[in-house]
Amino acid sequence: MSCKMGNFMNLRVFALLGVLLLAGGSGLSVRHLPSNPWKNEASQNIQMRYLAFQYQVIPVGNELGIVAEAYPVIDKLPDWASWYGEIMLSVYVSDEYGRVLASKDTVLVPRPLNREAGLPLEVSLDLGTNRHQPLSISFGYRLVLTD
């Protein structure tokens, strides 16, 4: 009986070590999201399923300012949707492999869904020593639409 218990404990220790190794080596990745290379002060667009982002990147020292508006993709929204119940917009700065180097989430107050008006987003991100490598910008969002 003690031999079986010892094997079970060894198995649990190895399983725990495996989980810790996987968790320690994993970082946030945005490879699955559309992205654009970082361009200073040029107006750019990223189209996603329900929102289209128009944005501009403004570097200030080691910080990166991003001013954006997220417009609803009208033909993708359900006809009954008339209100943003919850809105969280995210900005990600990633390296050439899609690894996130800096990010910021912004929660907006609920509001009527105006199909022609954009949702405002303005963030500042500290890039530290990463400023001098090829960088990309991506966006994410969480929307809860109501009627």
What are the roles of these predicted feature ranges?
Residues 99-135, 144-147:
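Short, solvent-exposed, Trp/other aromatic-anchored flexible loops in extracytoplasmic proteins
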Residues 23-41:
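Bacterial Sec signal peptide processing site at the extreme N-terminus
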Residues 1-25:
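Sec-dependent bacterial lipoprotein signal peptides
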Residues 69-81:
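Short amphipathic, basic-aromatic surface patches that mediate peripheral association
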Residues 35-58:
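Short, compositionally biased P/S/T/A/G/V-rich stretches that sit at domain boundaries
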Residues 91-95:
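Conserved aromatic beta-strand anchor motif in extracellular beta-sandwich/beta-rich domains
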Residues 80-89:
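Short coil-to-beta strand junction motifs in C2/discoidin
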Residues 62-66:
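Structural beta-strand segments of beta-rich domains
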